[in-house]
Amino acid sequence: MGKQGFKQSDGDSAFESFRYQFKYQKMVHGSDHKKLGSFKGGYVGKRHNWLQKHFSSIVFTFALMGFLFLLDSIMGSIFEPSVVTQSSSRSEKNSSDTLGDDGSKNAVQMYGRLASMASSALVERELKQDESKFWKESYRQASVWSPCADRKDLPRAENLQRNNGYILVSANGGLNQQRVAVCNAVAVASLLNATLVIPRFLFSNVWKDPSQFGDIYQEDYFMQTLKDDVNIVKDLPPHLKSLDFKEIGSLVTDADISKEATPAEYIEKIFPILLKNGVVHFLGYGNRLGFDPLPSDLQRLRCKCNYHALKFVPKIQETGSLLIRRIRKYAGPRRKLDKQLLGNFITGPQSNGSDMDISQVNYIALHLRFEVDMVAYSLCEFGGGHIEKTELQAYREDHFPLLMQRLKKSKPISAEELRSSGRCPLTPEEAALVLSALGFTSDTYIYLAGSQIYGGESRMLPLTNLYPHLITKEDLLTPYELAPFKNFSSQLAALDFIACATADVFAITDSGSQLSSLVSGFRTYYGGGRAPTLRPSKMRLAEILSENHTISWKDFEARVTNMIAEAQTVRLRGWGRSIYKQPRCHECMCRFQ
């Protein structure tokens, strides 16, 4: 929570006791000494005689009470020898097996000592009114990069008049995987001089969302934005609709093409099918186009698709705008980043005066990848004791049969080794420790994105104890406002995307997450050097936390701060790196001195 103190009733009691003593002393010293003296003398004499008469009885009573207390202590240690050991270790190694006095689960905590120091540091920082330096980008060079994948000075694609056939894409996964698939399909269509049909989204047993492209993105805007780069239509011509793609050899699955395939592989394997049949259907299409080597015009086209052509439909924009206004408590125009995501819904009714006069709430968006599937698949341990191990093992057996088969054939890896190698998802407790080490005060608003956190309230307590202002879209929007999104997980994920991308600070716990990658790329592209992202290294953090029994808070702060600052260094996109995550390259952005 950051703030500590005593209950009001305790304070009142202490004050009344102090006032009573002061009043008594004033009464004694301010009274008539002669009158008071006779009273005191008589009282002291009577008390002295009474003590002499009953001295033996008093001594015997105290001796008997001492003996009974000693006997009780001895009997307790005989019949419950483990009580002392258990109570002393519970703060550091709390288990989800334990319950509180009211029947609720205790906090599952792995770093009780560090959490205690973090709480004290937050109180001290609040008293000093210190503000974290990580509300801003660490390096000024971030501001010299600007979006330019849609620049108009580039020549129009010369091959638009030629059409080698149609490309139909059925993308799998959730919102973010489908977004990548769409932009990869745009690049492939351009590469093969083909016409792209508006992509379709497959129904997933995991996401259980029937949404199609037009339910999430603006179709006409998508086609208009890319009209000078690739031909796009909403449907196949009638003479191709009736074809059996599998029978004629036009059905292409993940088994037919490499993950992150090169342009050469598409020309060698896919182009002949396209010329022969006039159509190719990519079924279950996803991350099937590599980043290097790739012609610069195709790389730029992927950036243009992701950062400019894919705009959410008005229903999502309007609710996203409402969500942001309720977090920030403002209703005026904001940054280029907000405009791109919210469109015309960026403006709203003013509260009082101009935008500058409104008290704005700054917030951190935190994407916790601590869902049960992620936790179970990692094979790590998270301080939850026997119940946690049993639950996760049962989940693995039910949901990951291939993983279980592989484990039977491979050498087991210890939980300690998994953690030290950076293969364990960060817990809510670890996220809280990182934020407190970076100087964010306990009154910071944190928007929590993602699905259900494994362990529920007991797992979240170490985070909410330090940062009580934790909010979700379900907290900020009414059931009526959320009703149009019910049973549409991808559309709900779009609201999280908006809240994370437009946040003052975006904190990720898993750099491999598609949401984290796409959001951090969006913030780099449109942020103008004013949209910092916190990327902790799981391996480095595990090394720091391994010293949790001995490390000082000052040392912990310094090492975590260095880790985050180094990750914010302004770098060009490296060879083979994703333009969806790292768009700082000459194909996507322009550098102005």
Name the predicted role of every residue range:
Residues 1-54, 83-100:
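Short, low-complexity, Lys/Arg-enriched N-terminal segments of secretory-pathway carbohydrate enzymes
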Residues 401-415, 442-486:
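Catalytic donor nucleotide-activated moiety binding site of glycosyltransferases and closely related
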Residues 6-9, 224, 534-593:
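Leloir-type glycosyltransferase catalytic cores
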Residues 46, 52-70, 77-110, 117-422, ...:
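Secretory-pathway glycan-assembly enzymes, especially type II membrane glycosyltransferases
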Residues 183, 203, 491-538:
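A donor-sugar binding/catalytic signature common to diverse glycosyltransferases
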